[in-house]
Amino acid sequence: MENLFDINGKVALVTGGSRGIGAMIAEGFVKNGVKTYITSRKSEQCNLKAQELSKFGECISVPTDLTDMKEMDKLVRHIEENEKKLNILINNAGAAWGAPFDTFPENGWDKVMDTNVKAVFFLIQKLIKILESSGDNSDPSRIINIGSIDGIGIPRAETYSYPASKAAIHQLTKVLANRLANRNINVNAIAPG
């Protein structure tokens, strides 16, 4: 049982890996022998976090705005050109927006849905070949989407697009879990909060 959760030698990509939950996940991976790529829209912050985590193992910074499909394509190319496998994808990058109901702006929906839902779907789609080839029946690849309790219940804050986006992530996770299981890819979500 001592190797029940052994992840040494795996390769992971953690989006939004420069701070918060993403940084904690990346740190856990690096400290347990996982070659870990992290992304963030903020280049300097991403580079500094990768440098900090590299004290414990291998951590590579790939600054990326996942709402920009050209940048996403560059990220995918970077992974595919440098790795033979990608065992774990953590979709953690996210955005929130708060404003009163009567003045909640359209761009508050666009930014949040583009980051929290659309980018997750398209990143999985673009990485599907390497994820599929990295898994097998006994050790599938893993995709973990970071949802939120705000996507399950009613939040106190006036963040209308955020809970809607997290509810969408929970549902997208169920759909993808069903569709990708036969391709040796497990898809799950967690709901922090």
Feature roles, as predicted:
Residues E2, F104, I154-P163, V175:
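Active-site loop-to-helix junction immediately N-terminal to the catalytic Tyr of the SDR YXXXK motif
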Residues P100-F101, P105-M113:
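Substrate-binding pocket helix/loop in short-chain dehydrogenase/reductase
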Residues K129, N178-R179:
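Alpha-helical segment proximal to the catalytic Tyr-Lys
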Residues S148:
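Residue(s) in the substrate-gating loop at a strand-loop-helix junction
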